[in-house]
Amino acid sequence: MRKEWVEKRKKDSVRTQMYYARQGIVTEEMEYVAKVEGLDPELIRKEVARGRMIIPANINHLHQKPMAIGIAAKCKINANIGSSALASDAAGEVEKVKVCQKYGADTIMDLSTGGDLDAIREEVIKHAEVPIGTVPIYQILHDCNNKIEDLTIDKMLEVIERQAQQGVSYFTIHAGFLLRFMPLVAKRKMGIVSRGGSLMAAWMMHYHKENPFYTAFDDILDICRKYDVSLSLGDSLRPGCLADASDDAQLEELKVLGELTLKAWDKDVQVMIEGPGHVPMNQIERNIKIERDYCHEAPFYVLGPLVTDIAAGYDHLASAIGAAMAGWYGASMLCYVTPKEHLGLPNAEDVREGIVAYKIAAHAADIARGRKGARDVDDAMSDARYKFDWNKQFELALDPDRAREYHDETLPQDVFKEAEFCSMCGPKFCSYKITQDILEKHGA
Amino acid sequence: MRKEWVEKRKKDSVRTQMYYARQGIVTEEMEYVAKVEGLDPELIRKEVARGRMIIPANINHLHQKPMAIGIAAKCKINANIGSSALASDAAGEVEKVKVCQKYGADTIMDLSTGGDLDAIREEVIKHAEVPIGTVPIYQILHDCNNKIEDLTIDKMLEVIERQAQQGVSYFTIHAGFLLRFMPLVAKRKMGIVSRGGSLMAAWMMHYHKENPFYTAFDDILDICRKYDVSLSLGDSLRPGCLADASDDAQLEELKVLGELTLKAWDKDVQVMIEGPGHVPMNQIERNIKIERDYCHEAPFYVLGPLVTDIAAGYDHLASAIGAAMAGWYGASMLCYVTPKEHLGLPNAEDVREGIVAYKIAAHAADIARGRKGARDVDDAMSDARYKFDWNKQFELALDPDRAREYHDETLPQDVFKEAEFCSMCGPKFCSYKITQDILEKHGA
């Protein structure tokens, strides 16, 4: 859908959404987003210009539907997919893309580490109508035959440009983790739990030189500026357990991410900031406020956070609690966690569970923030319940298949789809029926 | 375990924990609770005397292990079980009791409505080491052959005493829903969604007389006082959807529950207050504060709340978000919700899912409140993760079977239980390994 839009901008020296926004231009992408969000196009433009909202939309991902991440927009969710050394076919990843889009992921990160990474990414982008994000260090490492010490800045930039050229709309870059933070890491219970972060640590320790993503940040920005790839500034030092939450390692890195944000904005590159992780409920609001402060209100993109460390097997749920609260307090996008977190690799069913958990969290956050119209679908559901319209209830549920399946376990016959009761109270003592009698006598 | 304790009190005119507490006596139950909670026995006594904590322990449930519900104690969870017209054998309910206790329910409510209710309850109590709660109106209705208009106060009191005599430790009584609230119900989107509440409505509408539980409240208190049955004052008018949350119907009933609390305390009867239901995140704290105010700090026992209405099939999760927050803000017990909520009757697997979801919520709440030692198990889990001790990780997880099962899906062989990596990053780029290298170089 973006073919013509992008085509006519061909001669512009810079083509990022932020650049246009700052020129006072409302792009077609902004118009589209305004429509989807039910907001004024001029508000979208202002938010993008201010850096408080991003529209991740690589100029080469032409069939992508524009979407916005930022506090003025609805809370978004990301789902991670990706091949591994064990399961590395493109078809499998395309299947996952379909599951993600079916259940409503707003963006998808392709975290592939096994197989032909370029070919897989090409297929993923081809089948995605949502923005695709990546963590380029995974491919850089892959191209170095898993020898992190072979990483050079040239190799790094080559891979980043290759991915940008392919149509990736945002990159997680671990540029904020500096050599001087090593002693802070050593104080932690869990150290580094970010894979990209630990790779950076390994490289820095090997050469005792500064983080190459930090050193070459300007060159990375030039690539992002060229293709309008947004940056998702990675939190290499996100806490891996409650004990490490909101500690010096995390917050010192966050300050650097704030500095990098300003650098990116100088080049009209869109930025969001990645956040934790594992955080007890009473520290979530504080984390959101600190990010807003240190990072100049760039959109906050959090991973959960998990509100306890002992929920292995149910971490989608333990993290959805933190995610819902984070969204309410002001996070703009929630990265899902699946039930397999800390235990193994998610399959398609885990992806579904993770996405629905996060749709619940993001929607609950929109309601709690009082976003216009956020509760309309809930009200429609309540009306359907009250009217015993079961098919409508299934349709309005975040996972219609699951709702229908559970209902039909007890009452499978079609006639019960209009029955004025359900299996819980049975026909004689349905609360809704009794309420309707009250209404008749006492009026509405 | 309580046989001797109860035996020696035989001649006391009143034998409720609240009575003893007010006499300055620390009972064996209080001692036991103090040990379990890691609190001073005198604090327990004071809290029980003040009505801010209850120890639901019927004098006839002698093998029950004492436990406490109140803000000074750890956050508790309740699981509901119960027969229906379709599945009404006692053995099935005993199985559910075992599942509840295995996964850590702190109390169990037997909400049976089908089969021989007395016989089922007897079996449930026999197999339960946790307090059993009931909703007597279900049996009253059953004994009236499902004709609610046949309910009389005598019949009501007879059933209540029968259940008390059997050893039920707390009763949900819908005494706060008064005739004058009918017009408030008529204003709602969803009316009444509490089954007990709708039965009361049906009776009141039929006779146009005041709620019989309210009228006979003093007689009910006498029974509770005799057997030390705690009251769980039911919220007949809990909101059934976000649109009805915190409305006049809910709050007017809550005020009456506050009045009834004082009446109960006058007779040394222990009380907790039931709460919603469906509440958007931004109203949860307010709900907790209002209850504290209206109900004189009697422990608050909430059902979820669900933070969105559109999560059918995942309502255990949508409600665990609200429950965790409620626990953090000060609710003392969380009533679980299963994935079948709004759709059908839960099976054993649903019970497991519901309980674990609520264990997560209650534990996260304890951590967020900063309870002494609450995070110790999380720290132990983090240590086990860092040491690659997989068996220890499974053991510390809230659902060890599930954690092991998910891990073994990818790496089933025994050797991987000590492997210094997992299936997520593989052996070469384990973040923990890299952190350990940093530690060697930079010290702890």
Swiss-Prot record, chains A, B:
Lineage top rank: taxon: Bacteria
The protein's annotated pathway: Cofactor biosynthesis; thiamine diphosphate biosynthesis
UniProt record, GO biological process: thiamine biosynthetic process; thiamine diphosphate biosynthetic process
Catalyzed reactions per annotation: 5-amino-1-(5-phospho-beta-D-ribosyl)imidazole + S-adenosyl-L-methionine = 4-amino-2-methyl-5-(phosphooxymethyl)pyrimidine + CO + 5'-deoxyadenosine + formate + L-methionine + 3 H(+)
Disulfide bonds listed in the record: none
Gene Ontology CC terms: cytosol
Binding-site list for substrate: 80, 109, 138, 174, 194-196, 235-238, 274, 301
Record InterPro entries: ThiC, ThiC/Bza_core_dom, ThiC/BzaA/B
Residues annotated as binding Zn(2+): 278, 342
Keyword 4Fe-4S appears in the UniProt entry: yes
Entry's cofactor comment: Binds 1 [4Fe-4S] cluster per subunit. The cluster is coordinated with 3 cysteines and an exchangeable S-adenosyl-L-methionine.
HAMAP family: ThiC
SUBUNIT field: Homodimer.
Protein name: Phosphomethylpyrimidine synthase
The organism of origin for this protein: Nitratiruptor sp. (strain SB155-2)
